[in-house]
């Protein structure tokens, strides 16, 4: 019985993933139940979030290691990008811009450090291990948007 439940669950996960693949707009890449797109144009974090919202999405949030790895696959090597994390409301209480719970992290060693008291937005860093860093929201970087399939 447990094997049957496992197979049914596996089928449901894959069917949802294929459903997303069928309805992501051209240029957007499916992953599980969302569509993602990397934008190389360098803008500040607030502008990146507004640009994603204008496309019916938000900056990408990350809920598990596999999703983090997927996002890295969208970004050229040695490229820093914005994703949707911020602690602009209460210092060191990180939130996702889409409102989802913050349950997974991939911070670089000694991060977040709020360097000079002005780092409140989350970037994927260009370091060897492509970990997360808090950065000044006014820094201009490319970004990754996420949205539900249309």
How should each PLM-predicted stretch be described?
Residues 1-150:
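Extracellular, disulfide-bonded carbohydrate-recognition/adhesion ectodomains
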């Amino acid at each position: 019985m447990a094997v049957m439940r496992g197979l049914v669950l596996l089928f449901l996960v894959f069917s949802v993933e294929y459903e997303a693949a069928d309805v992501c707009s051209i240029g957007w890449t499916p992953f599980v139940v969302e569509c993602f797109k990397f934008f190389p144009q360098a803008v500040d974090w607030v502008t990146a979030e507004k640009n994603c919202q204008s496309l019916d999405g938000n900056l990408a949030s990350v809920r598990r290691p596999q999703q983090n790895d997927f996002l890295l696959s969208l970004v050229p090597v040695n490229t820093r990008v914005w994703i949707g994390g911020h602690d602009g409301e209460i210092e060191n209480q990180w939130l996702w811009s889409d409102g989802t719970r913050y349950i997974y992290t991939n911070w670089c060693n000694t991060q977040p450090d709020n360097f000079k008291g002005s780092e409140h937005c989350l970037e994927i860093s260009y370091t060897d291990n492509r970990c997360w860093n808090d950065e000044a929201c006014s820094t201009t970087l490319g970004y990754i948007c996420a949205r539900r399939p249309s």
